[in-house]
Curated annotation (Swiss-Prot):
Organism (species): Rattus norvegicus
Main localization (coarse): membrane
Protein name, as recorded: Ephrin type-A receptor 6
Compartments where located: Membrane
Residues carrying sugar: N342, N396, N409
EC number of this enzyme: 2.7.10.1
Major enzyme class: transferase
Keyword Transferase in annotation: yes
Keywords attached to this entry: ATP-binding, Glycoprotein, Kinase, Membrane, Nucleotide-binding, Phosphoprotein, Receptor, Repeat, Signal, Transferase, Transmembrane, Transmembrane helix, Tyrosine-protein kinase
Residue numbers carrying Phosphotyrosine: Y605, Y611, Y830, Y977
Gene that encodes the chain: Epha6
Domain Eph LBD: 33-211
């Protein structure tokens, strides 16, 4: 008991005067200590045993509060060979494993006592012995175990006695482990003058506590001071575990290292370490340590601990509305309905309702009724009318009605609805308008017939309408594939009642509709007619007929040629005819050899390798630039073929534009020159805002003013616009230092892209863009690839590093000059003159079978999407190329990057279909991204591409249905992780379908192979669940 004072101290045998001081005996207890013995609190006699009897003396005095003060004293310093023992009563150890003994005592300085230098001591010894029961009066000192020799930090003298100064010493010793039920303590004196004022025996515990809303019970620490006891807490009332709450009990009785926590359940909030129910008028919808919230408008609650507020009468909350959203009500009726009618179309327009009910999801429905003279005699209009775009779920305030009948009273009821209209039992408010039709349009075409069919064509005819109501201007024929009725259609016109439709697919059924146009307008479309194109056998029969015609024509032509030949021989003009014919044939052969076959309206890619001289290919597709128009400013990069500079290009009549310039170094090989010019001849064929633009080339004239002999051909890939190397000094005339000799460089001049390659640009600006901005970048890349695909060009190295970004964030596809050599060794990498093509971007069929196509470019585009959404992260991270190939073969696909909307990741998965024919076309991708940009809310909706995925349930891959998550894990040989999934709360397939690779690592799946197998199965499960839900991904 620190800080206590002795009330009375009496030294025996007359050597000292009594020392009287006040001692209250009121000592505070520490919360982490459990006291087994405290002599200062014992009210009766201690009854400790002494040996011999004339050794230790017990002295008891009463303090001012009438409480006893027990002391034991000994001072036999005059006689040698002292051996005085004092033993406590039996002490129960309770739950202790280690005990602590605190002793308060005073000790006389031997130097202050005359004539006792040989016999006086200044220490005493502490002993103990364990026992399961009391020994009574039996006492055998030899059986006791020594704990320690106790010495005083301060000893008193005769002067201290005179000045009434008490020097009290406190010493603590620990004993353990204690294994029996109890123990004795013993004090041995061998000749000291000492007074044992108090003895306190205790053990330490980590006391009951509440941390992070979790309760932890009293805990006894281990004997080993370096070992901690892990204790799991239990959540306080009205709370639940978020992460398992844990504390560690230290050897000193202190709680250490808090882990995990509990959170208040729904309807409860945390106040001063406990969970209290929300007051009436307040709610809390989700478990967590947030405060209760006031009920939103038009809702209330009158009880405590409410998780959701109830809507007032007439107000509702939709199923998907969050609890924090105000209750809303159905809208009022639309206003100001008006119509506009012509011969063939009726347009209905209206104003929004005056009261939207507090919601933004307003839609309209139009109900049509045909009424007679009596307004009460109405019937439904049926399927005869067509509504554009549709009669229900309208977002805009108008609709077009077609195919109505003349001289009929139509009543249109326009209803306004929102997300809670279906919850109300009240009739839906509407506004009605009645329209009487009177049209002069032609009647419908009644019949269409097929005259003949080939593999790619159909010849159709029909009869003119019975009532045209004027001169027929033309016919419009609309047609589409029967299987793709809802996707797209084509149309053509004919002035005659017949038409030949070309460009069709063989053995395919098409649907045709036809309508008439007169001066009064269009008629309605006819009913649908089905016709099928022919197959190869039908064309063979047609070809046989054509052969007969050709053979007949050939015989006639040969006869005519003989007659003409005789005629020219007779007239003497045969020689002129033969020369002219030879000249014409030679010109035609030369034209064919150069592969310059052009078709009107169609631009196709021409491989520069078909030209003997690469310079011919370059000048076929790109213009020569006068070197005097080029001003070089600085070197911005270096590569295999030379250096890349930035500069300015002067254009007559226009201002200077920034450009990037690269040349071929002097002393180059013919192969290097061919590869260098090949890139320019490829770029020169492209003209698209999302393709890097070639300004021109320099191949014919020397350029001594520049004096540059080396430029890098890989500048379109290596982020050159960011300045890879420190700029070289440039003279005022625009040339580099004279140490570089003048020469005759081959130069390629392209537009300057300020922000460099896309991957490094995104890494530099990580997290700076909105999702819509990133989608805009992806849309630009897809548009450029669509252009290349339409031209028949396969890129084969599409990656973010090969996309360049200008100052307006426009992305442009680059890197067209790399030659791609596929070695015979099946283990060979796909090499180029610029290095290896990374496996991570390459489609599996291109890796396995060397099959590059637009579909393999689509696979690479999916990887580019992942790079963009992850801000330039490396695909497949640190996996080796071999692991990447094996993972893809096993069905593994990259997970969604952080913050990536579900619809974009789903598009990536479509691009990574193993069957290349199932991947979307770039046309589909551009269309889909356009819709996302127009409707950003669709970014967070899971979609399925019906052009990519199987079109009927029978085409869906077989996937077993599992009853439990454990069954699913067993099926993929991962049953050892059942407890991990259960403990983490992933107990339903809906939750599992949303798991990411981070979730799988977090629950304890460490092995990469196991992670890969589980992720692969989750992706298959997710696609299967999407088919079950029958969601559409329309492009």
């Amino acid at each position: 008991m620190g800080g206590c004072e002795v009330r009375e101290f009496l030294l025996q045998f007359g050597f000292f005067l009594p020392l009287l001081t006040a001692w209250t005996g009121d000592c505070s207890h520490v919360s982490n200590q459990v006291v087994l013995l405290d002599t200062s609190t014992v009210m009766g006699e201690l009854g400790w045993k002494t040996y011999p009897l004339n050794g230790w003396d017990a002295i008891t005095e009463m303090d001012e509060h009438n409480r006893p003060i027990h002391t034991y004293q000994v001072c036999n310093v005059m006689e040698p060979n002292q051996n005085n023992w004092l033993r406590t009563n039996w002490i129960s150890r309770d739950a202790a494993q280690k005990i602590y003994v605190e002793m308060k005592f005073t000790l006389r300085d031997c130097n202050s006592i005359p004539w006792v230098l040989g016999t006086c001591k200044e220490t005493f010894t502490l002993y103990y012995i364990e026992s399961d029961e009391s020994h009574g009066t039996k006492f055998k000192p030899s059986q006791y175990i020594k704990i320690d020799t106790i010495a005083a930090d301060e000893s008193f003298t005769q002067m201290d006695l005179g000045d009434r100064i008490l020097k009290l010493n406190t010493e603590v010793r620990e004993v353990g482990p204690i294994e029996r039920k109890g123990f004795y303590l013993a004090f041995q004196d061998i000749g000291a003058c000492i007074a044992l004022v108090s003895v306190r025996v205790f053990y330490k515990k980590c006391p009951f506590t509440v941390r992070n809303l979790a309760m932890f019970p009293d805990t006894i620490p281990r004997v080993d001071s370096s070992s901690l006891v892990e204790v799991r807490g239990s959540c306080v009332k009205s709370s639940e575990e978020r992460d398992t709450p844990k504390l560690y009990c230290g050897a000193d009785g202190d709680w250490l290292v808090p882990l995990g926590r509990c959170i208040c359940t729904t309807g409860y909030e945390e106040i001063e370490g406990s969970c209290h129910a929300c007051r009436p008028g307040f709610y809390k919808a989700f478990a967590g340590n947030t405060k209760c919230s006031k009920c939103p408008p038009h809702s209330s609650t009158f009880v405590e601990a409410t998780s959701v507020c109830h809507c007032e009468k007439g107000y509702f909350r939709a199923e998907k509305d969050p609890p924090s959203m105000a209750c809303t009500r159905p809208p009022s009726a639309p206003r100001n309905v008006a119509f506009n009618i012509n011969e063939t179309a009726l347009i209905l327009e209206w104003s929004p309702p005056s009261d939207t009910g507090g919601r933004k999801d307003l839609t309209y429905s139009v109900i049509c009724k045909k009424c007679g003279v009596d307004a009460s005699q109405c019937e439904d209009c049926g399927a005869g009318l067509r509504f554009i775009p549709r009669p229900t779920g309208l977002i805009n305030n108008s609709v077009v009605v077609l195919d109505f009948v003349s001289h009929v009273n139509y009543t249109f009821e326009i209803e306004a609805m929102n997300g809670v209209s279906e919850l109300s039992i009240s009739p839906k408010p509407f506004t009605a308008i009645t329209v009487t039709t009177d049209q002069d349009a032609p009647s419908l075409i009644g019949m269409m017939r097929k005259d003949w069919a080939s593999q790619n064509s159909l010849a159709l005819s029909w009869q003119a309408p019975a009532f045209s109501n004027g001169a027929i201007l033309d016919y419009e024929i609309k047609y589409y594939e029967k299987e793709h009725e809802q996707l797209t259609y084509s149309s053509t016109r004919s002035k005659a009642p017949s038409v030949i439709i070309t460009g069709l697919k063989p053995a395919t059924t098409y649907i045709f509709h036809i309508r008439v146009r007169t001066a009064t307008g269009y008629s309605g479309y006819s009913q649908k007619f089905e016709f099928e194109t022919g197959d190869e056998t039908s064309d063979m029969a047609a070809e046989q007929g054509q052969i007969l015609v050709i053979a007949t024509a050939a015989v006639g032509g040969f006869t005519l040629l003989v007659i003409l030949t005789l005629f020219f021989l007779i007239t003497g003009r045969c020689q002129w005819y033969i020369k002219a014919k030879m000249k014409s044939e030679e010109k035609r052969r030369t034209h064919l050899q150069n592969s310059h076959l052009r078709f009107p309206g169609i631009k196709t890619y021409i491989d520069p390798d078909t030209y003997e001289d690469p310079s011919l290919a370059v000048h076929e597709f790109e213009k020569e630039i006068d070197p005097s128009r080029i001003r070089i400013e600085r070197v911005i990069g270096a590569g295999e073929f030379g250096e890349v500079c930035s500069g300015r290009l002067k254009t007559p009549g226009k201002r200077e534009i920034p450009v990037a310039i690269k040349t071929l170094k002097g002393g180059h090989m013919d192969r290097q020159r061919r590869d260098f010019l090949r890139e320019a001849s490829i770029m020169g064929q492209f003209d698209h805002p999302n393709i890097i633009r070639l300004e021109g080339v320099v191949t014919k004239r020397s350029f001594p003013a520049i004096g540059v002999e080396a430029f890098c051909p890989s500048f379109l890939r290596a982020g050159f616009l960011n300045g890879i190397q420190a700029p070289h000094p440039v003279t005022a005339g625009g040339s580099l230092p004279p140490r570089i000799p003048a020469g005759r460089p081959v130069m390629i001049v392209v537009e300057y892209m300020e922000n460099g390659s896309l991957d490094s640009f995104l890494r530099k600006h990580d997290g700076h863009f909105t999702v819509i901005q990133l989608v805009g970048m992806l849309r630009g890349i897809a548009s450029g690839m669509k252009y290349l695909s339409d031209m028949g060009y396969v890129h084969r190295d599409l990656a973010a590093r090969n996309i360049l970004v200008n100052s307006n964030l426009v992305c442009k596809v680059s890197d067209f000059g790399l030659s791609r050599v596929l070695e015979d060794d099946p283990e060979a990498a796909y090499t180029t003159t610029g290095g290896k093509i990374p496996i991570r971007w390459t489609a599996p069929e291109a890796i396995a079978y060397r099959k590059f196509s637009s579909a393999s470019d689509v696979w690479s585009y999916g990887i580019v999407m992942w790079e963009v959404m992850s801000y330039g992260e490396r695909p497949y991270w640190e996996m080796s190329n071999q692991d990447v190939i094996l993972s893809i073969e096993e069905g593994y696909r990259l997970p969604a990057p952080m913050g990536c909307p579900p619809s974009l990741h789903q598009l990536m998965l479509h691009c990574w279909q193993k069957e290349r024919n199932h991947r979307p076309k770039f046309t589909d991708i551009v269309s889909f991204l356009d819709k996302l940009i127009r409707n950003p809310s669709a970014l967070h909706t899971l979609v399925e591409d019906i052009l990519v995925m199987p079109e009927s349930p029978g085409d869906v891959p077989e996937y077993p249905l599992f009853v439990t998550v454990g069954d699913w894990l067993d099926s993929i040989k991962m049953g050892q992780y059942k407890s991990n999934f259960m403990a983490a709360g992933f107990t339903t397939f809906d939750l599992i379908s949303r798991m990411s690779i981070e979730d799988i690592r977090r629950i304890g799946v460490i092995l990469i192979g196991h992670q890969r197998r589980i992720v692969s199965s989750i992706q298959t499960l997710r696609l299967h669940m999407m088919h079950i839900q029958e969601k559409g991904f329309h492009v």
